[in-house]
């Protein structure tokens, strides 16, 4: 998915958000915005994939701020909220008529742990009620039966956010019961609110998946040229790729890797429009 005219304002908003997480120095924040504008000006006209451009911008901002992980406290908070709500989520999945479908929905509800997205608020304090309400609301696009059918061979699960990854474990367990091999992939370095190896271990993903890999240098989503050989091989040999979140959708929706199950909450207009849903809708869409 190529960058939309709406994307730059959101990117700059997120730059400001993450800079404010670590400093009140207006000159330093302005430098972050200035550098981001330069990168946008140099690259926007070529219509790159938004997540690829965002990766370049956030890496530069981190350099300016001199901080490895501006979102560290935010991610820790998300993980703690998710850890506390996970027993309820497990109860909802296990008590449903279709645990696989419900685990898909719960994992997508977890996709709301996405900080700094323009117009999107993470409801930490009321997440229990939010979870129950969204499960009742259900999916706008529901390809869960096809996802279940495709989960028999080698499955690669591309994670997205910290916090969210706790809810992913419920779906991973459902997939693990059916598949030949389950590989989970996280970010190789801290980038925005995305899950890294540390978050995966905290959520005990390493105890569920047969293999825990990274996307290399910590890109937002997937940049094929940055993938470690073992991750690229796993993706190329997968019978199903489960791709969580909007960044993975942006990176892979026009690519050749298939079949892919895109599981996400459409949190912005460009992604919602590209999929054909409304902002706020939950999507489980298979592309073959």
Curated annotation (Swiss-Prot):
Q: Which SUPFAM superfamilies match?
A: AF1104-like (SSF111321)
Cofactors needed by this protein, per the record, are: [2Fe-2S] cluster; Mn(2+); Ni(2+)
Q: Where is the signal peptide?
A: none
What Pfam families does the entry give?
ARMT1-like_dom (PF01937)
- The record lists Mn(2+) as bound by 160-161, 194
EC number from the UniProt entry: 3.1.3.-
Which terms are listed as keywords in the entry?
Answer: Hydrolase, Manganese, Metal-binding, Nickel
Chain span(s) of sequence motif Subfamily I KC motif:
267-268
Task: Indicate what this protein is called per its UniProt record.
Answer: Damage-control phosphatase AF_1104
One GO MF term = metal ion binding
The main enzyme category here is: hydrolase
Sorted alphabetically, which InterPro entries does this protein's record hold? ARMT-1-like_metal-bd_sf (IPR036075), ARMT1-like_metal-bd (IPR002791), Damage-ctrl_phosphatase (IPR053682), PH1575-like (IPR014444)
